[in-house]
Curated annotation (Swiss-Prot):
InterPro entries reported in the protein's UniProt record: TOPRIM_DnaG/twinkle, TOPRIM_dom
Domain called Toprim: residue spans: 57-137
Ranges in a coiled coil: none
Gene3D superfamilies: 3.40.1360.10
Organism placement in taxonomy: Viruses, Duplodnaviria, Heunggongvirae, Uroviricota, Caudoviricetes
Pfam families (alphabetical): Toprim_2
UniProt protein name: Gene 57 protein
Amino acid sequence: MYRGCLAIPYMRWSPWRNWSVAAIRYRRLDDGKPKYMTMPGDKPRLYNTVALTRYSRDMAITEGEIDAITAELCGIPTVGVPGAQMWKPHFRELFLGYRNVNILADGDEPGMEFAKSVAKTLPNARIIPMPEGEDVNSLVTSQGKDALLERI
């Protein structure tokens, strides 16, 4: 079932185990459906919560793990939400202490809807839209990291 998929580990902190794998999400590398799969019964959670443990005045949120990885590689502390409908009200508390929470919105209608739904729950949110038809990963892949950094 998961053969030929990219395994994306979701980590969590425990004082007894330090960082350990809490869940694994799988992304198909072919064009098959569904594009993403999780273990049965898994609950929505944030990807790359280790970013929340590092000192930073600003934090970014993306829709999806690949965009979060790409933004992190560009030097932007970023967590990912595993889909446009997966932002949960209790996530809000994790972001209230930041100067800005930059929501790196995909350049399409669902991406803007995701960004708006997150932004309305955070008083420190700023929506940073990607160009039409682009997401963080495709923008950096086609134009380089400066294209992303200049938007912020």
